[in-house]
Amino acid sequence: MLERRYLVLEDGTYYEGYKLGSNDLSVGEIVFNTAMTGYQETISDPSYTGQIITFTYPLIGNYGINRDDFEALTPTLNGVVVKEASTHPSNFRNQKTLHDVLVQYKIPGISGVDTRSITRKIRQHGVLKAGFTDNRDDIDSLINTLKSTELPRDEVETVSTKTPYVSTGSDLSVVLLDFGKKQNIVRELNMRGCNVTVVPYNTTAEEILAMSPDGVMLSNGPGDPDVVEVAIEMIKGILGKIPFFGICLGHQLFALSQGGTSFKMKFGHRGANHPVKDLRSGKVDITSQNHGYAIDKNSLVNTDLEVTHIALNDGTVEGLRHKTLPAFSVQYHPEARPGPSDSNYLFDEFMTMMKEFKEKEQTANA
């Protein structure tokens, strides 16, 4: 017989369902993701650190989970909410069920709830604090706890690598600042022959320049970009000296370093089907996104940044490029995983930028 579990929101709303995953109950910011597949990559994305994910697709876990498709070694989210969790996955690569993996990593979850209702509430009222309890009598107490709980805004230190390491390639060298990187960023660079050195989020400009890389990338990551001040100062120190490419949180930090400002979105962009328009070509890409903060377009007016991409759903800034220096960024995930590969060409643009900058430097020093 399935045991009861309750998902409780800070506004007093609660949903009765069934236990899924760990008995180590937790609280977090509840968000929703609209992707139909890719749940393994989603739950292992460090950008979800501290959050509780509501999957809008009604059946999650139907093709199981395997050891190769994790985007980080250890998932760091605080909970999973699904309409139905598959107990009998069918796929030749399947090794574990969703429930087994959630238990393994001490992540609580709930199934059998109306995920459409939860999603509508988040969409209408914005993200809320939420938590789980297995005892109906504890709901009122949990509501009070949620109201008084201050969720952390800075989760980058939790998920960033503590020591540098190298993913070997044979061509250009790239330093990747790890704010909670997805592994597929490294894969995309390695596929293009790059030698990738992954370094902690608080690595200084001087330390990066001492490595003499051909380019620098800033990864995705969780939390509020305003609190990662050390990275903002680092960007100021390398800009113009090395080609630069930022993704997601890296995009936001790039904008902040040049005088832009960020804001917390009502419910964010999380899914694998977000249309983005390239203002230079008019082309529309379907993109994978996962962010709760965005850059204020009006704050960029008197900066050296130009907006290159916008979200077609709400007009928010999705891409930036420096007007004179070799640096650009996107708010979405060109490496996908999960999601479409429409924007993989951005890695090729970064490769071209690095090669042209290197040739220019060599010519100048000849």
From Swiss-Prot:
Q: Which Gene3D superfamilies match?
A: 3.40.50.880, Carbamoyl-phosphate synthase small subunit, N-terminal domain
- What NCBIfam families does the record point to? CPSaseIIsmall, PRK12838.1
Keyword Nucleotide-binding included in the entry's annotation: yes
Q: Name one Pfam family in it.
A: CPSase_sm_chain
> What are the BP-aspect GO terms?
'de novo' pyrimidine nucleobase biosynthetic process; 'de novo' UMP biosynthetic process; glutamine metabolic process; L-arginine biosynthetic process
What is the annotated role of this protein in its UniProt record?
Small subunit of the glutamine-dependent carbamoyl phosphate synthetase (CPSase). CPSase catalyzes the formation of carbamoyl phosphate from the ammonia moiety of glutamine, carbonate, and phosphate donated by ATP, constituting the first step of 2 biosynthetic pathways, one leading to arginine and/or urea and the other to pyrimidine nucleotides. The small subunit (glutamine amidotransferase) binds and cleaves glutamine to supply the large subunit with the substrate ammonia.
Extract one GO molecular function annotation from the record: glutaminase activity
Can you say what this protein is called? Answer: Carbamoyl phosphate synthase small chain
Enzyme Commission number(s): 6.3.5.5
* Domain Glutamine amidotransferase type-1 residue range list: 173-360
Disulfide bonds, paired cysteine numbers: none
**Family label:** Belongs to the CarA family.
Chain segments carrying region CPSase: 1-171
Organism phylogeny: Bacteria, Bacillati, Bacillota, Bacilli, Bacillales
Residues recorded as binding L-glutamine, renumbered to this chain, are S47, G221, G223, L249, Q252, N290, G292, Y293
Report the catalytic activity.
hydrogencarbonate + L-glutamine + 2 ATP + H2O = carbamoyl phosphate + L-glutamate + 2 ADP + phosphate + 2 H(+)
The entry's keywords: Amino-acid biosynthesis, Arginine biosynthesis, ATP-binding, Glutamine amidotransferase, Ligase, Nucleotide-binding, Pyrimidine biosynthesis
